[in-house]
Design a protein with these regions (language model features):
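Hydrophobic transmembrane alpha-helices
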Residues: 1-38
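Generic transmembrane alpha-helix motif of multi-pass integral membrane proteins
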Residues: 31-45, 82-87
Length: 153
């Protein structure tokens, strides 16, 4: 578990340095979510929850702020729940499951933003978040599946 948390911290730090689309703030690759995929499919939900809590709290203390922690906890919690439930659906593969996780991660964060600002204009951002969550979620899931099949970690 320590290795996963260390890798998650490194990935979180790298993501603070990389701006995926400069014109659109807040879109991230979600590198540490590849670790969530690996943990979910290899060790189960309990390890995922512990990993996410440790990574988010430590990352928020080191690289972020209270609001970032709220957004991350909401996104991680909802996406992990969705991925856990969809893992039981036989026709959804690892990249597809991760794609749904990415989408719901962004949806949860959108609702946190709405709760904070109390303005419906935040929902104009939904199409961008839907597309970016699907794209990055699928890519991260593909990486996770690649590692799982080859037992690289």
């Amino acid at each position: 578990m320590g290795l996963f948390i260390c890798l998650g911290m490194i990935f979180s730090y790298v993501e603070t340095l990389v701006v995926l689309v400069p014109a659109i703030p807040g879109i991230k690759i979600g590198l540490s979510n590849a670790l969530v995929v690996l943990l979910l499919y290899s060790y189960g939900i309990t390890y995922c929850i512990l990993f996410q809590l440790c990574r988010i709290l430590l990352s928020s203390l080191l690289f972020g702020n209270l609001f970032g922690c709220l957004f991350s906890l909401a996104g991680a919690g909802i996406s992990l729940l969705i991925m856990y439930l969809l893992k039981k659906v036989k026709w959804i593969d690892v990249p597809g499951n991760s794609m749904f996780g990415g989408i719901f991660h962004n949806i949860a964060q959108l609702f946190v933003a709405y709760a904070l600002v109390q303005n419906t204009t935040v929902f104009y951002y939904f199409p961008v978040l839907l597309f970016s969550g699907a794209l990055t979620g699928y890519a991260i899931g593909w990486i996770g599946e690649f590692i799982l099949k080859r037992r690289l970690l």
